[in-house]
């Protein structure tokens, strides 16, 4: 096997610093809201930094408790995506065997392992989608016969223009397929 006949790109998935950050911030905020709502119901402060004497339970305390519970649940959801490494995996291009393998981890259950394999002959082109603005989108797609387009880049933290151009050009050259810009 030639060392240059296989290319493998790892995908980070949900174990990004931003997800850890948001899980902690949203969880802390949710606990603060929940304790404030409960303090207004019980008519004494559960935490010394919360002063809920002037908050009446209905409707403010009830709404704060509701938002607190939602924040805690969302924080737990983010924590579970981090724990289970949802979205983590790799893209492997093997010219020797003539296959492309795309692997990702999902949530526990029957679809925990997402493992897709395609023949290199089924690939029509590599397509790059660039969209700038407040929410930039920079994605490399694998265009398969039958009008399927499979995203190859990670979600959430877009690559720089230079990185995405280099990776797409390198991949198109490696697979000897057309590179489409959109």
Swiss-Prot record:
Source superkingdom: Eukaryota
Task of the protein: Seems to be required for the assembly of the photosystem I complex.
Matching PANTHER family: PHOTOSYSTEM I ASSEMBLY PROTEIN YCF4, PTHR33288
Pfam families in the cross-refs: Ycf4
Family (UniProt): Belongs to the Ycf4 family.
Keyword rRNA-binding: no
The gene coding this protein: ycf4
Cystine connections: none
Name of this chain's protein: Photosystem I assembly protein Ycf4
Membrane topology: Multi-pass membrane protein
Species the sequence originates in: Tupiella akineta
Transmembrane segments: 22-42, 66-86
